[in-house]
């Protein structure tokens, strides 16, 4: 049995295959996922697992160099926005790099998900709880 951080075989596999600048999406239960993009659905019920639980576990194994959020999160979900920014700041310190944070409209965000390696669907049921994580390198 694997004893690393990520036990979910699909998530572990997609992280191990990421190359520099590849993207991985963690989303809430409501984000539409393009048919052309791999869907890793781990939602069990409303709120389980939460968006931040998934982000926390994924970023323990994934080297992140950038994150893209929908601009709407600032007004529509400020508490989660602040929690995510704090997490990314702590991740920067742990990784020893700067994580570039950028914003786009929710409509554009949905289009960008089509280019990601996979979308991990959480059970989160709060607005705009979505992030595109861009893979960095460990060297």
Curated annotation (Swiss-Prot):
Enzyme class: isomerase
One GO CC term on file: cytosol
Similarity comment text for this entry: Belongs to the RbsD / FucU family. RbsD subfamily.
Subunit structure, interactors included: Homodecamer.
Function of the molecule: Catalyzes the interconversion of beta-pyran and beta-furan forms of D-ribose.
Reaction catalysis annotation: beta-D-ribopyranose = beta-D-ribofuranose
Gene label: rbsD
Taxonomic lineage: Bacteria, Pseudomonadati, Pseudomonadota, Gammaproteobacteria, Enterobacterales
HAMAP family recorded: D_rib_pyranase
Taxonomic source organism: Salmonella agona (strain SL483)
Location(s), subcellular: Cytoplasm
Superkingdom classification of source: Bacteria
Protein name as it appears in the record: D-ribose pyranase
Entry GO MF terms: D-ribose pyranase activity; intramolecular lyase activity; monosaccharide binding
Primary location: cytoplasm
InterPro entries linked to this entry: D-ribose_pyranase, RbsD-like_sf, RbsD_FucU
């Amino acid at each position: 049995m694997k004893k690393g951080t990520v036990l979910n075989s699909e998530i572990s596999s997609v992280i191990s295959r990421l190359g520099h600048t590849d993207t991985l999406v963690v989303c809430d239960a409501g984000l539409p996922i393009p048919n052309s993009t791999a869907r890793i659905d781990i939602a069990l019920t409303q709120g389980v697992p939460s968006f931040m639980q998934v982000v926390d576990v994924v970023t323990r194994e994934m080297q992140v160099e950038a994150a893209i959020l929908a601009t709407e999160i600032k007004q529509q979900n400020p508490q989660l926005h602040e929690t995510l920014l704090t997490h990314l700041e702590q991740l920067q310190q742990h990784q020893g790099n700067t994580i570039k944070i950028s914003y786009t409209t929710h409509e554009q965000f949905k289009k960008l998900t089509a280019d990601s390696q996979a979308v991990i669907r959480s059970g989160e049921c709060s607005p705009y709880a979505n992030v595109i994580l861009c893979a960095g390198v460990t060297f």
